[in-house]
Amino acid sequence: MPVTDSIADYITRIRNAGNASNKTTDIPYSRLKENLSRLLVEKGYIKSYTVITSEQFPFIRIDLKYTDSGKPAIKEITRVSKPGRRTYEGKDLKKYLGGLGLFILSTSRGVLTDKEAREQGIGGEVLFRIL
C-alpha cells in the first residue's frame, strides 16, 4: 500500500515502536529520513541508525533510546506540516516549549533544528516537533 505522507509514516513508526518498548524499528529508506535519523541521533532522541540495503528494498533500522526507568526518550513527536496544509516559518521562528523541545525544519541548507535555523538566520518548512 503506497504511503502518501512518508514523514508522518516515519514518526508514527518511531512513536509506535517506543510505546511498544521495541528495541528497534525498520523504516523504508529515503535520503530525507536518513538525514532526520542523523539529526535525532545528534540530539540524543535515538541511540543509532543503520542503513540496510537488502535485495528487495533498502531500509533504515533505528535503535530506540529509553530512560533508566524504561520509558522512551521521545515523549512526544507530532507532525506539523501536512500534505493538505503546509506550514512554513521564517527566520524569527519561536522556541518550542521555551526550548525544552525541538522543531525540525526542512530548509534550503538541509534538515535543521529550530535553534540551528535561528542561528543561521533562515526559515523553512516545519516538518515535526519533538519533546
Swiss-Prot record:
Xref: Gene3D superfamilies: 3.30.1370.30, 3.30.1490.10
Pfam family, one: Ribosomal_S8
Keyword Cytoplasm listed: no
Highest taxon in the source lineage: Bacteria
One of the protein's GO biological processes: translation
Any one cellular-component term (Gene Ontology): ribonucleoprotein complex
GO molecular function, one term: structural constituent of ribosome
Presence of keyword Metal-binding: no
Alphabetic keyword roster: Ribonucleoprotein, Ribosomal protein, RNA-binding, rRNA-binding
Record note on quaternary structure: Part of the 30S ribosomal subunit. Contacts proteins S5 and S12.
Stored NCBIfam families: PRK00136.1 (NF001109)
Biological role stated in the UniProt entry: One of the primary rRNA binding proteins, it binds directly to 16S rRNA central domain where it helps coordinate assembly of the platform of the 30S subunit.
Similarity remark: Belongs to the universal ribosomal protein uS8 family.
Protein name: Small ribosomal subunit protein uS8
Source organism per UniProt: Chlorobium phaeobacteroides (strain BS1)
